[in-house]
Curated annotation (Swiss-Prot):
It comes from Schizosaccharomyces pombe (strain 972 / ATCC 24843). The lineage of its organism: Eukaryota, Fungi, Dikarya, Ascomycota, Taphrinomycotina. This is Plasma membrane fusion protein prm1. The chain crosses the membrane at residues 15-35, 103-123, 286-306, 376-396, 567-587. GO terms for biological process: plasma membrane fusion involved in cytogamy; regulation of plasma membrane sterol distribution. Involved in cell fusion during mating by stabilizing the plasma membrane fusion event.
Amino acid sequence: MASSYLSLAARLSQCWISPWSLCCLYILMQFFLFTKDLNTKIGDFVNDEQATCNYIQEKVDILLDSPSLIANAAVRVAKDGIQSTVKIILSGISDSLIAAENVFIFFIEFSYGTYLCLIQLAIDGILDAVADVGEEIGTAVNDTLHAIADEIEDTVSSLNEVFQSAEDSLEKVASWLGEDINLPNVSIPEIQSLRNFTLSSSYDTEFEKLKAGVNFDSAINATKAAISKPFSSARNLILEKVSNYSFDTSMVSSPNKTHVVVCSTDDLTAISSFILSSIYKIRKVVIISLLIIIAGLFLISSIYEIWKWCRIRHKAFLLDEHIRSNKFEDTRDLISYIESPISWNLKYFISALPLPCFLSVQLRWFITYIFHPPAAMILFISCTSFISGILQLVLLNNIREDGSVISALAQNSFHKVESALANVSVAWANSTNQIILKNQENINNNMFGSIHNTTLSLNSTLNTFMNELNSSMTSAFGDTFLASTVQNVMNCLLYRKIENFEEVLTWVYNKSHIELPLLPTDILSKSIDNQTIYSSLYSSLNSSNSTVSFSGIFDRVEKSVISELNFSFLFFLLWLLICAFGLIGVLSSWLKSLFLSLLDLVIPNPKENITLPVQSLAFPVTKSCRPPPIPPRESHVYDFQNFQYEEDDCIDYKRSLGLISLSSDLAIDIPISPAIISDIQFNSITTESEETTYLLKEKQDRY
């Protein structure tokens, strides 16, 4: 190599080494190590998942065996409940039959008693009436007969007197005739019997016999016997069935045992493959993206190096022109430009804004301060850690979404177990209910058949009686005016009571059956509620049998990533603290300037300050002070303000001067006057030819 500066090829060989590319490489390596560690943890989880699956299967088998135990207990409870229900119902029906029998007998006795009372009342009335009338008739008859007997006797006496007179006359005549005439005396011996006759009081004996004969006891007893016989037989049958009834549990079968596979090796393989493939896809996308970004940064850095190479070559010849045009208000600004052209261009852009001069300078200083290499390094560390953590969280969130397959496994297991229990419960409940219905049918047919027959027979008898009675009444009275009256009387006295009895019999007929309670279809599945199933399966997924749980992996890794993000946030806070220091510096500078301005207004200074175009001098200089002498040529000090290049000299310099490679080379190639250090700008008057000769000689000696 003919020179010590770096050529374009040397520059391009290191163009990939930049803060941005190093940041991307750091993120890439950290993300790669993160995914590798995550794959290892997930592999451990998949290896232990089989044990967890077996544990879940054991829990599921226990849950699926529980219906048989519940069914046995339910059958025993149902047996006791049905037997107690049947006994209570049949005992109640037996009591109802007794009550119905007594109601019937009461009605009959009531009806018989009513009519008996009416008949006896009528007979008693007749007897009383006859007795009163008979007594009066007897007295009248006896008196009349006595009077008649007396009248007859008087008449007979008169007749005898007449006959005696006639006999005397006839005897005189007969004596004349020589005949003996003897007329008989008229006598009625029955007159004494008539006088002694009295009307007997035994004429009402028949009525008394009728009264004594009006007695319905035999009819009532016969009716009681006729009515009590079917009721007693029905009641005895019910009591016999009650004492002998027992629910046959041998007919009830046990629930069918079922088996549900909640997870298998294929499922576990599919789940692990799915999660690992998701991690692989995300890692591939992130790595490819980072590699593309690094390649783009490499291309940009290469273009930037080429552009900077050409720019340095061009700026090397125009440097004096820039200095001459006072683009750099301060010589230290030139050094800043050489060290960091991007930062200087940003400051130059800010200076172009329509801001006050002091504010523009302070803003440029603040940007330089917060992006100074130490502060920029802290900001780069913070951003790099933050981006790396965000990428890791994105990967975790995507895997967490993919990990919902594990939750879906538990959920599917939950639905499978729930569906299996529901099917077993429905099948067993239906078969058991059929047996209960069969027992119910036997009870209704065997125990209540006689009650049905009795009530139907009584209803039929009452209907026949009413029809026959109506026919008799119709045939007796026909279309006479008494038909309606008799019908109303019969309706009042008999028909309504018979209709009420028919309603009672109908009610007994309708109620003379039993309805046994049926088992609900969810009797087995409802006993094991959904929360119990889900809690059992979920606890199995996170049981102690599994050394690594899916949620535990995410929790630990997420905590680590969050800690990294917290550290990046701390670095960012540290950079913000540096920004605060910069703001404090800007504020203190502004206060200092304000204080000096106020001080100049209050206390005028007779001396003039020799100042730079922007910053104030560190010490005052009087007006009459002359500048220091021109330093000797061997001190390598040049006047940057008044130096002029000739065109030929620039051409010779272009041929003889080596290309400036770096900002440090540029700083070495162009020595800076000591006046920069002392904050004093020297505007020395020098001869152009001497300066040009010295510059060319110096450069030829160096290169």
